[in-house]
Every structure is written in C-alpha cells, then in structure tokens.
Amino acid sequence: TIIHVNGNILLGEIKKLNDGIITYKMDGMGTIKFQVDKINTFKSEKSFQVVLKGGKQYFGSFDTCGIERHVKLILINGSDRLFIEDIIELYPIKKNFWLRTSGSLGLGFNFSKGSNIATLTTSGSLNHRNRHSYAELSWSDNTTYQSDSINSNKSDANLMIQRLIYRKWYLGFNIEGSSNSELGYKFRILGGVSVINYIIQDYHNRLYVSLGSNANREWSKDNDEVTNNMEGLLGINYHYYKYTDPEINITTYVNTYPNFTTSGRYRVNYYLDAKVEEISDFNVGINIYYNFDSKPISVDAARDDYGIATTISYTFH
C-alpha cells in the first residue's frame, strides 16, 4: 500500500525502486511509475533488499510510522525509521531475473555527400543487479564507409562485474575485446581487476572512481606481431538520470591505462552517450568517443581516433 502526498491511497504491489522512480502494480489498473518524492509513506509485508544513499544495505519489510515522508523498516532483530528519499534502490527479494535487468539498443548513421563518407554506429547494453553485485554487458561498433568500401572500423565488447565489499566499496572484474583499424590493432583482449568507490550515489547521479590493473594481448593489423602487456587502470565514471519530462539519460567515462611493459606507453579512452526520450522508451541522442595510444602496436598507425554520431535508441527496464 502506498499513501500519496496528496492523501490518495494506492493498493497494489511494489515491483522495484531505482533512479528515483517507483514501479508499482496497482490492483485492477496495471503497472504505473511515478517519482519517489510523491510518496508520503508505504507498507508491505513482503521482504525487500534496500540500498540507502550511504551505501548501507538492509533486508526487511515495511510499515508506516506516523511521520510524513518516512517509513518503518522491519528487520529480523528490530526496526529502523528511514527517510523515504534516502532509499535509492528497492527490490523484492524473491523476484525473477528480468525485474532486475535493464538495457538499451542504439543505432546511428551519418553521411556526407561531398566526401561520399558514411558512418554506421550500433551499440547496446544489458545490466543486471542482485543482492551483492552488479553486472553489465556492453558493445558498440563504428564503421566508416567510403566509395562502397570499408575505410575504418572500431568495435568493442565488454563484460564488467562489480561485487560489493563494504557500503560504497566494490571489487571490479572486467573482460574486454576490441579492434581499431585507425590505431593499428586487429584485435585486443583484456582482463583486469579493480577497486571501485562510489563517491556519489543518489536518485539522479552515480559517480565512481576505479583503480586497478589488467593484462592484455594485442594483434597488429599490418603484420603477425603479437604483444603481451601489463597495464594499470585509473578511471572515473558518471551516470545522470532524470525521469521528469523530458527524460534525460547521460553516461560518460574516462579510463587511463599506464603501460608497465612498454616504457612511456599509455592509453586513454573517453566515452559519452547522452540521450533524451522523445516517445515512450525511444530516445534520440549523441554518441562521442575518443581513444588515444601513445605508442600503437603498428608503426604506421595513428595515435588517436575519435567519432561523433547521432543515435536513435530503445531502452527497457
């Protein structure tokens, strides 16, 4: 049961809460979504996983507490009173896999008649959360065509897993495969581990930094040369989400990789994906990437590569 700030009582079932939005299945009316700041209080006898702004997690059920904008969390060994807007994530414990899964699919295309150059961009992601971990699978492909031939290609696929250590601290694992003809490598496979700290974690913002190391293996585009490298990792990642009209979703990150194997070599990857919802779950936006390698594996390769594309995407929760 949810009690709205206007006094209305909504009967139904809480499906989840994240990004400042509660998903609620009302009796006889289907599923609705609305902002958490519209909730005065709520109650449910079901068990939930609760994540607060400070990173603390609880497992319990809810009851009203008689104080506006607050709720009583009922635990096995007691209870606690919570300010509703301090709850940033809420999931029923025994719900299925898909309730905790979200993602997006994107497509972009640019063409210049004067240069007869066309760029096709495809991208996508799948995200899943459970009690103590977060997993994300993402991929993208940027291919440039000129006069019916492929002029350059950049492809990436990455699997990242974050495992909760304590409050805002996570242990990160990632596996990545990529290719970039402009930077002179046919294929690179990478695996690494890092320590992650969420500096900001609230309704609209997620900001975290990561520090770690990885190992990679590269194949040159021009010859049979193969190199093995040990690298460090220093990264910063930011996500912004606004549900009110217009719905805005921004993800950006920059990762720096100092090379421990080749003296003086380092890599930098920057990425920005910004989109605005135009029709329910369909978005228009812009996608920008910039990659830099101070000492590419191929002698004739460029040291940097970048791309900008307008995109149309579909998101699902």
Segments predicted by a language model, with ranges:
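Membrane-embedded beta-strand positions in outer-membrane beta-barrel channels/transporters
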Residues: 106, 119-123, 156-158, 170, ...
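Solvent-exposed loop/turn segments connecting transmembrane beta-strands
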Residues: 110-119, 145-152, 179-187, 221-223, ...
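Repeated loop/turn-to-beta-strand initiation elements of outer-membrane beta-barrel proteins
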Residues: 131-137, 168-171, 203-207, 241-250, ...
